[in-house]
Amino acid sequence: MSPRSGLLIVLGFTLWRVVMLNFDATDFFVDEAQYWFWSQNLDLGYYSKPPMIAWVIRAMTELSGSNAIYWIRLLGPLIHMAAALVLMKTAKRFVGPEIEGWTGATYITLPGVALSSVFFSTDVILLFFIAIALLAYFGLTQRRSVGLALVMGLGVGLAFLTKYAVLFVVPGGAIALLLIPAARIAVRDVIIAVAVAAVVALPNLWWNLQHDNTTVRHTQDIAHWSELGINLRRGLEFFAAQFGVVGPIIFFAMLWAVYRMIRGRSDDREKMLVWLSMPVVLLITLQATVAKAYANWAVTAYVAGTILAVWLLYLKWPKGLRLSLTINGIASLLFPLATIFPHQLLLPNGDALMKRYLGRAEVSREAAALATQAGTDIIVTDNRDMVADLFYTLRDASYRIYARAPAGLPESYYEQEFALPADITGKVLFLTDGAFTCATETPEVLKNWQPTEGNYKGKTLSIYKVSATCLAP
């Protein structure tokens, strides 16, 4: 495949995704709604993530003049397109022009890329910055350059401001530097890159120190390091899920590259790509085995990993490269259709395939309507999913929205920054999916119901009119 053909495939899939977003019929997922809310309250850090995604969303909403779902999710395909173009140049510089087109076409059709081109996440931005850092790093292995060292440091620093998962690449990269002479760069360039990365990351590190290491503690919490125990099934499930994240043939090729390295059949460049990718998969598989890990936690492996797989397939199994592009390409074309027909695509148990992306805004609108009827403009909830959507869906209304104040440490950004103030008195509307009683009064039940589809299907939701003091921790 020529570079021109690869470029056309990248542009073609991007255009398809941009057009299909116009017909998206799903709600924001809780994380997307939260990222949007962060963008309305700019800071140097947040409860669960560094600040980059909020800054990027704010830039888009300012440029577009809209807070609509379309414009925010549009960032996904556009940034992935940019990452694909950077990877093409990286592959050309590190391997040669023969895989430049294949690298771009393969990356843009990865299942994980297809998914995050529809539902926006931090992974999208993270992959872009890692691609930039990798391009500069490979350049530095060939020549000394202050400019490339600055770019590498900037890429790593901005990746850190996006998601701390960039650090998963460090152990493998360090091993490559120790074992492979061709992987080493000039000491001066290392110092420059590290210094720039540190300066870029410093504002978020300072923010964490000022907020009791909130983001760091949250990262530890979701990793479940306090509940360590060997569970081989979890590890195997995570490992198997990687065949779905990048496609079966691409992940197989990455494993094949490891086998080749162990058998002494790979050259230094192939070894470098292995060390910059597969240790990430190994680390997160270990994390899944002893605690917990989500399928996308190893995503940082698939920047270098894509180049590695494409190169090996190009040399040893060209038919596999074409087959992979066909399989992943078809899946990538079909996936946006699931967001256009979310109510029609059902699983065998009757649930919508897009269940967790449906029914959220409807609950928020119901709460708003009942608040108006009840004569209050204050809506409180103890559910993170609900408060996230309340802020987004009711963004143009005048309701005052709060999370119920926690009894201990906050467990979300909303409890941390937007908990119900103690000085609020009088009646408020309380939305919950759990049982609720008050010691000092009998709450007035405005509505109890069970949604028939979407994220809250099968759950009993309740809306009460109650004194604010009843919601005190």
Swiss-Prot record:
Catalytic activity, EC: 2.4.1.-
UniProt membrane topology term: Multi-pass membrane protein
Function summary: Involved in the modification of the lipopolysaccharide (LPS) lipid A moiety. Catalyzes the transfer of a galacturonic acid (GalA) residue to the 4'-position of 4'-dephosphorylated lipid A, using dodecaprenyl phosphate-GalA as the donor substrate. Acts before the other GalA transferases RgtA, RgtB and RgtC.
Protein name: Lipid A galacturonosyltransferase RgtD
Pathway listed: Bacterial outer membrane biogenesis; LPS lipid A biosynthesis
Gene Ontology MF terms in the entry: hexosyltransferase activity; pentosyltransferase activity
Gene behind the chain: rgtD
An example Gene Ontology biological process: lipid A biosynthetic process
Species in which this protein is naturally found: Rhizobium johnstonii (strain DSM 114642 / LMG 32736 / 3841) (Rhizobium leguminosarum bv. viciae)
